[in-house]
Swiss-Prot record:
Organism: Arabidopsis thaliana
Gene3D superfamilies tied to this protein: 1.50.10.10
One GO term of the biological process aspect: cellulose catabolic process
Signal peptide range in chain numbering: 1-26
Source organism phylogeny: Eukaryota, Viridiplantae, Streptophyta, Embryophyta, Tracheophyta
Protein name: Endoglucanase 13
Subcellular location: Secreted
Amino acid sequence: MSQLKNGSSQCLWTSICIVLIVMSMAREAVSTNYAEALKNSLLYFEAQRSGKLPPNQRVTWRGDSALRDGSDAHIDLTGGYYDAGDNMKFGFPLAFTTTMLAWSNIEMASQLRAHHEKGNALRALKWATDYLIKAHPQPNVLYGQVGEGNSDHKCWMRPEDMTTPRTSYRIDAQHPGSDLAGETAAAMAAASIAFAPSDKAYANILIGHAKDLFAFAKAHRGLYQNSIPNAGGFYASSGYEDELLWAAAWLHRATNDQIYLDYLTEAETGGPRTVFAWDDKFVGAQVLVAKLALEGKVESSEQIVEYKSMAEQFICNCAQKGDNNVKKTPGGLLYFLPWNNLQYTTAATFVLSAYSKYLEAAKASIDCPDGALQASDLLQVARSQVDYILGSNPQKMSYMVGVGTNYPKKPHHRAASIVSIRQDKTPVTCSGGYDKWYNNPAPNPNVLAGAVVGGPDDNDVYGDERSNFQQAEPATVTTAPLVGVLALVF
């Protein structure tokens, strides 16, 4: 009998050891994925670079491109980022990308440093802000686009070979764009905070631009696509009130000046929102004001309470504890809209991650209609979304290119889908690119590491086809929010 007991004991301990080893290996695999994903997310921005590439460029299949941008307006507009899978520089989504990169650098600074990616994260941010500084040559002048969207999209060319028009478009006092100027002000203000610890002089330059742009946006009201009609078919703005709030919130955080807080408390809060994205920043502004309230840095008022309430309502809905919960796919992905859904998922995931830090610091929680949320609950939801994106989904596919082995091989991306100019300098023509590369059934010759595609549909189904642009096209606005989240959940 005792031998049986001893045998059972040994069996039990062996089973426990095996389970612990398997769990440890699983944790290590997840950690490895986070590390790989964080590194790749920043490499992606190097693949999106426009202009003269620096000596420390790590994505070596790319080359210099668009070196005459701005020449039609007698201004240097080289640099910046191509917005997605085309060769366009759209200022509106670029500015949002910049703000989110800055927010990651601010909120997750210690985590980025611990994972040895802080330098790369700041370089990704500076590539954007250097361009935005060039694009703002006068207080009331801001260049908001380089390139012709329609002609660019009719061609399938490497950025290094571009022959499409590179027209420069601007807003000014006579041709306003409060949304574009406001978002760019937010980007500059947020970036000034990110750079202040390491480069105070550069931070001061950025805050000067931010103040001028906010004043410009307020004084000359209007939608930017009315001044730059070419942008309307690609990144039309639905309004500018959110960008003005967003800019004021970042300027207040950067300067602590009362005038920006006054603007926030005198304006409408935006009410309940269903998304946070390049065209709707109300949630971002609400979260920044809620942070002030949690820290006790502002006097409580009906308006401040509403900002916090609206921010937390969005979070409750993302965490499935609200009155109007965000739809989830059967596999567990937060699903907002069919076209490039992951841009909304990554932005919402950033909000959850940042707010978890604010709650933890304040030792606070959120009272949702369907129960309380602690800081750890928010982080758990954020991690579940990251895990889904990196492969814990019904397709067993990572929707970030280059992570693991099963990831999209044919993202809708001109530069990645055409042989590198480093390998073959033969120019690729406008129609030739479509004939030889766009319609090629083979995987893209260049791995666009770190690119997050649009993602699966509401049934967790994804079609890995270059022509499937709604699902297969990556964009800077999708990856930017994920940088900080990856650093935090790692």
